[in-house]
A protein has these predicted regions:
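Terminal low-complexity "docking" segments
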Residues: 1-122, 126-247
Length: 247
């Protein structure tokens, strides 16, 4: 169960930044909470790195995730404590330089599902990344080795330090079946969200064949009744929706 939410101020007070540690903000332009606008107002000199820069998605500004470094007394931190939004981004501490952090985040632009399908990884959305990191346990540091501890939607998570390996080309991370099954048992929203995004990017014709709310219900129904151990999980979803269109 989630613990009582903690504010950035209290989180940093409990474990202050040590020499060589940096506070990073991952923030999304896609959130309806206007987090990016608030950041520009409170930190007008912030240097934001577009995480999809240098990829085929570098022009997707309306949904772009960004990386920036903050001071421990940043004027943006109170907004984080006060907002009710859960999809705007998160904070993390690292000993790596901004460019190295940027490259590791960019290497997670897409990941592989257990059936081999490549999907966008919503790492900037705390609703998705927190249960994944928590579910990975000690292996969480293998996915984002540049970060030592996180504050995601008021929940603190520590993964410890490790040697930061060389950045790999995406999609390099294969989402473990066991992790997805655990997420499904606890809350299927992460898997449903990933499948919705996969449909929008890879099969827009199917995606726009239904009102979004209806499509989400159909995807949820499929996800709940189809074992993730199926080798062709995404193919079965596509076939199921194609049949629904015909009907």
């Amino acid at each position: 169960m989630p613990s009582e939410p903690i504010s950035p101020k209290d989180w940093l007070a409990q474990q202050p930044l040590q020499s060589g540690e940096r506070l990073y903000l991952i923030i999304s332009a896609a959130s309806d909470a206007d987090a990016l606008k608030t950041l520009y107002l409170t930190e007008p000199t912030a240097q934001l790195l577009p995480i999809w820069g240098g990829t085929p998605y570098s022009t997707w500004q309306p949904v772009m995730p960004y990386l920036t470094e903050l001071k421990a007394n940043s004027a943006f931190l109170p907004w984080i404590a006060e907002t009710d939004a859960l999809d705007w981004g998160w904070l993390a501490v690292s000993r790596s330089a901004p460019n190295e952090v940027f490259e590791h985040l960019r290497s997670l632009t897409q990941v592989k599902m257990p059936d081999g399908t490549e999907v966008f990884f919503r790492f900037w959305d705390g609703r998705h990344i927190y249960p994944i990191l928590r579910g990975l346990g000690e292996k969480a540091g293998e996915v984002l080795p540049v970060f030592e501890r996180y504050l995601i939607n008021g929940q603190a998570l520590e993964v410890g330090t490790r040697v930061v390996p060389k950045v790999r080309d995406w999609p390099w991370w294969e989402v473990p079946k066991g992790l997805l099954e655990g997420l499904m048992a606890e809350n299927p929203s992460t898997v449903i969200g990933n499948m919705m995004q996969w449909l929008q990017e890879e099969h827009a014709d199917l995606y726009f064949s239904f009102p979004e709310s209806n499509l989400k219900q159909k995807v949820a129904r499929f996800v709940k009744r189809t074992p993730l151990t199926e080798e062709n999980f995404t193919g079965l979803l596509k076939a199921y929706l194609e049949k629904e269109v015909v009907v």
